[in-house]
Amino acid sequence: MVCTRKTKTLVSTCVILSGMTNIICLLYVGWVTNYIASVYVRGQEPVPDKKLEEDKGDTLKIIERLDHLENVIKQHIQEAPAKPEEAEAEPFTDSSLFAHWGQELSPEGRRVALKQFQYYGYNAYLSDRLPLDRPLPDLRPSGCRNLSFPDSLPEVSIVFIFVNEALSVLLRSIHSAMERTPSHLLKEIILVDDNSSNEELKEKLTEYVDKVNGQKPGFIKVVRHSKQEGLIRSRVSGWRAATAPVVALFDAHVEFNVGWAEPVLTRIKENRKRIISPSFDNIKYDNFEIEEYPLAAQGFDWELWCRYLNPPKAWWKLENSTAPIRSPALIGCFIVDRQYFEEIGLLDEGMEVYGGENVELGIRVSEISHTGLSSAPMMVWQCGGSVEVLPCSRIAHIERAHKPYTEDLTAHVRRNALRVAEVWMDEFKSHVYMAWNIPQEDSGIDIGDITARKALRKQLQCKTFRWYLVSVYPEMRMYSDIIAYGVLQNSLKTDLCLDQGPDTENVPIVYICHGMTPQNVYYTSSQQIHVGILSPTVDDDDNRCLVDVNSRPRLIECSYAKAKRMKLHWQFSQGGSIQNRKSKRCLELQENSDMEFGFQLVLQKCSGQHWTITNVLRSLVS
């Protein structure tokens, strides 16, 4: 699942991706944030205590840093891990697997456990030794236990999507669904195997399915892909195989908690245009303990990575912890009326592998207009439906340490995000291009044919994206004042770029150009220079502005710098100088042999140094 929670360490962000992806730590190594995001998303932590509330020398240094970065990425991300029998175990002390578990294991046991961990991204060794029917703590708000539900509710088909999942994890997902869903409500379970190469998911899984179906004929269906289609198209495959009035689309590394189904089916029975997400808790990847997560809505940033949000103010005012939480988007696992899902266009099967489809669905439902509709409502919010998170429906989900699903997740998410932007986001599509640091014209990225999706939007009579931002996602920060963006380079040393430096400091630096988030620069019509991430919501204070502080360049939170009337306005024209309006000092490079790349940023009397930025949207007037 893709949703983030904010941290303030050198490991700057962890992103959780839906479906067959998982948790990836976005590492800022050697002052470089490797922005290869994948499944929890940069986001505001919901309130935890209230559930309601010289050239050779330079080259060698670069190589050393890149080598270190590569090693970290291999350990933490491992885009394409070897099979269990092929994986070479790292030194035990280097693996996060043994930080809180496994000290009592023999060396051989640790070796086996580590091989499986490298392959699956979670502790399959431990999972194989846990009962399939293990109990879970009831983490629902206390009021949920007193709720009553209609006797007559629609049946549900539960769909599990997987590729190379550990068999015990998959079986525990199935078992918990069967044990904790009332039998009269659970019509069937559908397993979508996206072309797994793991042999135990063939013969052994077939034996299990045959055993269950021997007692309940046809209860478990298996859909096997002949090639890997990716999470998005796998979900659609599962929907096509489903026959119940309601379809629940889930990852295959979850465990259902007691009473999860009745609240969901009740809300859909009341209004079939509701798309529902349960509230998620965490199954820790190392020791499989259940970690309670605060209640949260689900949103996204301008790269369209999912992120957890604090519930809206209107929800807090209810003072009712059992009330549904209105949510701008979905993180990936959701429950939907089967026919309604088809009416609004399912998922965009022109997307690749993973990412963006959950955001697209949430926006689409929101923008659909009710006017003139017979059977086809628009994209959930824009198109007449709604998205809710239910506090009384709780499901635990494994956040993997790394994912086995794709070698380049970021490229897929970026491409999919641009499809969403071009179809649904109107003039705000520029924000997606800016966040990804991509030219808005001739981006060089083939997003495929979007004709059918544009026709769908027209057919569904969806509202504008501006309406969505104002009415559904008012927390989303708008950046209509940005007139230039990209990386900022000085003519004196063009292989170095302005960089935000370590997260823990406020001193900008110059660093070898890599084009990732720490080097993103945004120049506004009010002559401010933002460096680093585009803060997604108005509640975040992540935006940092370049400021002249006692003749030294510093990065200060923009809102604070403005309130304190600091020197944060800069005259800049493409190929010209960057001069502070008040102090008249220029941002320049100065040779310094003590610095890593031989140069440092200074503010001094202008000497004629020239700066260029990658993308200019409007004329820059100095």
Swiss-Prot record:
Lumenal side: 36-622
Cytoplasmic side stretches: 1-12
Region Catalytic subdomain B, residue ranges: 324-400
GO cellular component: Golgi membrane
Residues covered by region (Catalytic subdomain A): 153-267
EC number: 2.4.1.41
Annotated positions binding Mn(2+): D251, H253, H397
Catalytic activity annotation: L-seryl-[protein] + UDP-N-acetyl-alpha-D-galactosamine = a 3-O-[N-acetyl-alpha-D-galactosaminyl]-L-seryl-[protein] + UDP + H(+); L-threonyl-[protein] + UDP-N-acetyl-alpha-D-galactosamine = a 3-O-[N-acetyl-alpha-D-galactosaminyl]-L-threonyl-[protein] + UDP + H(+)
Entry membrane topology: Single-pass type II membrane protein
Entries under PROSITE patterns matching the protein: RICIN_B_LECTIN (PS50231)
One GO BP: protein glycosylation
Residues of this chain annotated as glycosylated in UniProt: N146, N195, N320
Binding site for substrate: D194, R400, Y405
Pathway in which this enzyme or protein is active: Protein modification; protein glycosylation
Gene Ontology molecular functions: carbohydrate binding; metal ion binding; polypeptide N-acetylgalactosaminyltransferase activity
UniProt superkingdom: Eukaryota
Main subcellular location: Golgi
UniProt keywords, alphabetically: Disulfide bond, Glycoprotein, Glycosyltransferase, Golgi apparatus, Lectin, Manganese, Membrane, Metal-binding, Signal-anchor, Transferase, Transmembrane, Transmembrane helix
UniProt cross-references to SMART domains, sorted A to Z: RICIN (SM00458)
Family statement drawn from the similarity comment of this UniProt entry: Belongs to the glycosyltransferase 2 family. GalNAc-T subfamily.
Role according to the record: Catalyzes the initial reaction in O-linked oligosaccharide biosynthesis, the transfer of an N-acetyl-D-galactosamine (GalNAc) residue from UDP-GalNAc to a serine or threonine residue on the protein receptor.
Annotated domain remarks: There are two conserved domains in the glycosyltransferase region: the N-terminal domain (domain A, also called GT1 motif), which is probably involved in manganese coordination and substrate binding and the C-terminal domain (domain B, also called Gal/GalNAc-T motif), which is probably involved in catalytic reaction and UDP-Gal binding.
Protein name (Swiss-Prot/TrEMBL): Polypeptide N-acetylgalactosaminyltransferase 18
